[in-house]
Amino acid sequence: MLLRTVSSATAETTAALISKNTYLDFFKRSTSISHLAQTHAQIILHGFRNDISLLTKLTQRLSDLGAIYYARDIFLSVQRPDVFLFNVLMRGFSVNESPHSSLSVFAHLRKSTDLKPNSSTYAFAISAASGFRDDRAGRVIHGQAVVDGCDSELLLGSNIVKMYFKFWRVEDARKVFDRMPEKDTILWNTMISGYRKNEMYVESIQVFRDLINESCTRLDTTTLLDILPAVAELQELRLGMQIHSLATKTGCYSHDYVLTGFISLYSKCGKIKMGSALFREFRKPDIVAYNAMIHGYTSNGETELSLSLFKELMLSGARLRSSTLVSLVPVSGHLMLIYAIHGYCLKSNFLSHASVSTALTTVYSKLNEIESARKLFDESPEKSLPSWNAMISGYTQNGLTEDAISLFREMQKSEFSPNPVTITCILSACAQLGALSLGKWVHDLVRSTDFESSIYVSTALIGMYAKCGSIAEARRLFDLMTKKNEVTWNTMISGYGLHGQGQEALNIFYEMLNSGITPTPVTFLCVLYACSHAGLVKEGDEIFNSMIHRYGFEPSVKHYACMVDILGRAGHLQRALQFIEAMSIEPGSSVWETLLGACRIHKDTNLARTVSEKLFELDPDNVGYHVLLSNIHSADRNYPQAATVRQTAKKRKLAKAPGYTLIEIGETPHVFTSGDQSHPQVKEIYEKLEKLEGKMREAGYQPETELALHDVEEEERELMVKVHSERLAIAFGLIATEPGTEIRIIKNLRVCLDCHTVTKLISKITERVIVVRDANRFHHFKDGVCSCGDYW
């Protein structure tokens, strides 16, 4: 009897086990929600409704198939879910783009149960906070993980590092990484990727070097996919070739995506033939490989080849996805190719995807097709934060700063809140416009959102203050930053250069070198610019030579132009000419224009004729060269020749850009043109000018009229310079502000000699500091003296 009972119990247990294993097998093989629902019914029918292992597996499978709310209902049916089931549901919500719900499940676990979260629980919670872009929640969860002693687990550590990078908290990410007792390949890859995505390419490469040199961890294909874009951005061809060799040795090279990464690398380094050779190694290129090669051809000027390859892609029958188009659009720098892609998107209804329309908006803006960009933005049925950022950035890049600011204010009324990308774009617009009050308002917004910890936002703030005339505030913010990248240093150097403070710029440059930051070609450009506006010939010469011989950089046309400017402004015109003739590359119009400007400063008419002939050959439709040459002749009192140059420009219908000056009172910008009569306070403005004129005459002022039109009477010429836009703006500033208040104005053209003299006198008469930003630099007028030393 006992034997029969035992046998019966064993049989029932075996049947139950077989049945349970069968259900688990069903879950693995199920590819539809309806199939899983039928299996669920069978589980209930056969008495397994409370089997937590089966229900957990069912919840996981439903989540994988997107039936997250069905999965949630199963979770709710379990009377006492364990931590593993909580983890499964949290992961499911995150995977199905419901990070907020995942955080709610985590909160329920902590507050309503006696269960203790494990490292996986925290990893999923951190991932959810990152997905929901909840910086505060992420930091709180991190703190809870530390208290529970889970933060040293590798999966959790990688998720925390990834989250901090996503929130632009680069220093926090680095601290977590450094404190991890062990590091695996995933963690190293997360650091490399995080720096790269934050555009900190030098740091990304350094982490990669540390992985190779200091760690016993092996790199994998993901490592290469993360590091290659950083190497490409810095155009580090030699390092790229070393990584290519390493990839071959480690067996990672055979991966198609890695091969594609090398195509992009060589293309960005200008080695398009090497990229093309790699592309031919594909038996059947995928869409990503086509994208990389099309980009390579486009960025290297091979437009016909890029169009041909795009047609080949279309004829291949490949079905493009929205993600493919998003990656393809930004790299296509030719308008005809963009039209082709845009047409395909219209035909295939891809414009309904916010990511696709945003990508097209971005590329149209880069190609100066701003109206097409705005039309796409307005017609987009589903706007996103990136789409707002793309349009604001587009306006800023095209110099339409007022439109950028207007759209930013419109965005604030929408459901979207600005992120650091938005803030950086709008600060750039403020800098271009010279709108200090608006820039300060944005700075206040930054403080309220905790974006100041972002290295990019802080750098943008430094640039804004420098370009709006407040170099002291720019330096204060610079000194407060605990972490600086090469862009931060470059911005501060450039700011000092813009204000004519060359020695301060050099001091920052040497401080940068001492801090261990490697200068880039842009760094040298900023330093040379600063030297040119401070008359530092010897220092500029040394910097230029060190760039070539010590750091191995090949000078660009811009570097050569800066050296010509340094020599030319100092009066070394023949040496500047010899320097141009010895250049290893074609000088180009910018270099010759710089020398022509030096001819104007030092009144070398003969050399000016020779240089202008070169310029008229290179760029015959540039009215600026004609105006500059005419002014040189006028300064030499060769009025007939000046008239001939002007008549030539007139016959060619070349129009000079009208001059204007902006002054900001409160947060309201006021714009003046020469002889402007449109301002509501025009009567008071001209009366103020008349009073100032009398006081200046008493001080011995004589108008500089030699550059005014020679074919009018002297009295009329005096009147012409008397109503220049900067004088009207200064007069209005004197009326609209309290005595002793600093006046700041922005002029779109170079300030003329007479207005420069007048502004010095006004600063002395009114006992005001007057800051003028013209097309070249800043002038700080105080007590009758200008910071430029009359050297501009």
UniProtKB/Swiss-Prot annotation:
The molecular function terms in GO held by this entry are: RNA binding; zinc ion binding
Q: Which UniProt keywords apply?
A: Repeat
Give me the ranges of the annotated region Type E motif: 591-666
BP-aspect Gene Ontology terms: cytidine to uridine editing; mitochondrial mRNA modification; mitochondrial RNA processing
Q: Domain of life here?
A: Eukaryota
What are the ranges of the PPR repeats? 51-81, 82-117, 118-152, 153-183, 184-218, 220-254, 255-285, 286-320, 321-352, 353-383, 384-418, 419-453, 454-484, 485-519, 520-555, 556-586
Q: Does the keyword ATP-binding apply?
A: no
Region Type DYW motif, as annotated, extends over: 698-792
The record's InterPro entries line, in alphabetical order, gives: DYW_dom, E_motif, Eplus_motif, Pentatricopeptide_rpt, PPR_At4g14850-like_plant, TPR-like_helical_dom_sf
Q: What Pfam families does the entry give? A: DYW_deaminase (PF14432), E_motif (PF20431), Eplus_motif (PF20430), PPR (PF01535), PPR_2 (PF13041)
Matching Gene3D superfamilies: Tetratricopeptide repeat domain
Cite a GO CC annotation.
mitochondrion
Which residues lie within the region annotated Type E(+) motif? 667-697
Give the record's family classification.
Belongs to the PPR family. PCMP-H subfamily.
Q: Name the NCBIfam families for this protein.
A: PPR (TIGR00756)
Name of the protein described by the UniProt record: Pentatricopeptide repeat-containing protein At4g30700
Q: Which organism is it from?
A: Arabidopsis thaliana
Query: Which gene is annotated as encoding this protein in its UniProt record?
Result: DYW9
